[in-house]
């Protein structure tokens, strides 16, 4: 158990700028979680696609994080975190607006492009916002401060899920019921137009809301100016070499790759797993996912509080170990069925596998900010470039869900969705093993490495 500290987590004079940045965390949570269920929804909009092909949504979304992270670091290096945040928000807005022309083209690929642009903005935004939060106060409270800001992320996630449930999935199911065999091509096309308009609208409206946030940040004169050395005197090559000497940082990048892959895979295939287990519609499966995200949100606040008493690395190792056990429960617990209750919904069927799937989100709640905070320790002037490496590791969210989607197709796909989805959760299980290993490593090595100069 670590000693408690009275050091301020967020200085009072920058509380409003902190709230503005925390709102950014909520807004990328909204997009992330509004997007995950669409992997399955697009199977019905474009029935010619396979599960692995619709998983290209996540490939485009999280692949953009990899491609745009370095440009995000360059912006931070040359112009500072504030302008980096504004650049990221601007591209995020552009991506949301692109959903309108994509909906007119009646093809899957324009949506992939819109997702890529939107997520590219998120990559630049996260590359700047995460280290910006870390730099907003004392280094000894940096991980707790980042966990506090990240606690707003699941608030946006919940909003995204409710939007997806009521503004997308429920409406899509009404349209899907109109589709029958033998319909004329023109009738099918008209319904497809209606389906794509339903998908487009929430993203387009979110982009309009983000314009207001962009203006508030751009015009706020109290946003702190963070100086980590003269950008003109900092050699990128030597900084990269320095980062490659930091074993803790390199392990954090690897852990981040596997953790993000696990999170996106778990949440993306929640709908495949639950609908396959229970034989229900996507909008009904959303009720279980909402429980998971509520617990994810509450648990992130809980873990942030526990960090006053336990080292973040200890909590990371513990949560990762429990996540491994939960993954085993998801794989093998699908046949243990019982009746349960969902608040505000009513009686609902459950399996032990579904319970374990929900509890996995509790374990994941602290992982991203904790890995990011621990990995950023002792980087000094290398923090900006180091942050881009940690954000690039989000590439795991593009590759590992694609692997899990291919496993579902191999194990039976749509014809055996329940068992196929259950077996595919071996992918997150392996990822949590890596996160556990990093938690143990960080626990026994902190904080011994020298700060960069």
Predicted segments, located by residue:
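Extracytoplasmic gate region of multi-pass secondary transporters
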Residues: 35-39, 160-171, 241-290
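Helix-to-loop junctions at the C-terminal end of transmembrane segments
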Residues: 68-81, 299-312, 337-339, 408
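Conserved MFS/SLC helix-loop-helix module at the cytosolic interface between two early adjacent transmembrane helices
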Residues: 67-109
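Extracytoplasmic
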Residues: 16-44, 129-130, 266-274, 400
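Cytosolic juxtamembrane N-terminal segment immediately preceding the first transmembrane helix
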Residues: 1-28, 241
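Central cavity-lining transmembrane alpha-helices of secondary-active solute carriers
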Residues: 56-74, 290-303, 396
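Hydrophobic core of transmembrane alpha-helices in multi-pass small-molecule transporters
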Residues: 107-125, 258, 341-367
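C-terminal ends and interior cores of transmembrane alpha-helices
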Residues: 29, 90-105, 322-346
């Amino acid at each position: 158990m670590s000693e408690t500290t009275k050091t301020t987590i967020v200085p009072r004079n920058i509380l409003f700028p902190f709230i503005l940045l925390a709102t950014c965390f909520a807004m990328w949570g909204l997009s992330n979680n509004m997007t995950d269920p669409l992997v399955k929804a697009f199977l019905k909009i474009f029935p010619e696609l396979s599960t692995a092909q619709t998983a290209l949504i996540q490939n485009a979304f999280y692949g953009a994080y990899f491609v745009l992270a370095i440009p995000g670091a360059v912006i931070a290096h040359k112009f500072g975190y504030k302008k980096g945040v504004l650049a990221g928000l601007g591209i995020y807005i552009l991506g949301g607006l692109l959903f309108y022309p994509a909906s007119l083209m009646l093809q899957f690929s324009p949506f992939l492009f819109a997702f890529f642009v939107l997520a590219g903005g998120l990559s630049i935004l996260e590359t700047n916002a995460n280290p910006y939060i870390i730099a907003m106060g004392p280094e000894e409270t940096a991980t707790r401060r980042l966990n506090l800001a990240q606690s707003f992320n699941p608030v946006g996630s919940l909003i995204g899920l409710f939007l997806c449930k009521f503004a997308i999935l429920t409406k899509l199911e009404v349209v899907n019921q109109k589709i029958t065999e033998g319909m004329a091509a023109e009738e099918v096309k008209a319904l497809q137009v209606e389906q794509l308009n339903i998908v487009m609208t929430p993203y387009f409206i979110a982009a309009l809301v983000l314009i207001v946030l962009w203006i508030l940040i751009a015009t706020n004169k109290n946003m702190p100016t963070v100086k980590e050395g003269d950008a003109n005197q900092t050699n990128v090559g030597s900084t990269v070499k320095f980062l490659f000497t930091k074993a803790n940082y390199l392990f954090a990048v690897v852990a981040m790759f596997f953790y993000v892959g696990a999170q996106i895979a778990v949440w993306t295939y929640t709908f495949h797993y639950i609908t396959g287990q229970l034989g229900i519609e996507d909008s009904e499966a959303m009720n279980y996912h909402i429980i998971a995200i509520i617990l994810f949100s509450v648990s992130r606040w809980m873990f942030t509080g526990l960090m006053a008493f336990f080292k973040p690395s200890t909590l990371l190792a513990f949560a990762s170990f429990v996540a491994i056990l939960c993954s085993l429960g998801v794989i093998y617990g699908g046949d243990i069925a019982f009746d349960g209750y969902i608040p505000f919904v009513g009686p609902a069927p459950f399996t032990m596998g579904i319970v374990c799937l929900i509890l996995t989100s509790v374990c994941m709640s602290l992982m991203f900010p904790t890995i990011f905070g621990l990995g950023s320790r002792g980087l000094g002037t290398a923090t900006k470039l180091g942050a881009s490496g940690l954000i690039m590791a989000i590439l795991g969210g593009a590759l590992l869900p694609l692997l899990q989607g291919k496993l579902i197709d191999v194990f039976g796909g749509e014809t055996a969705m329940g068992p196929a989805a259950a077996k595919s959760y071996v992918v997150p299980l392996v990822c949590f093993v890596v996160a556990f290993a990093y938690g143990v490593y960080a626990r026994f090595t902190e904080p011994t490495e020298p700060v960069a100069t």
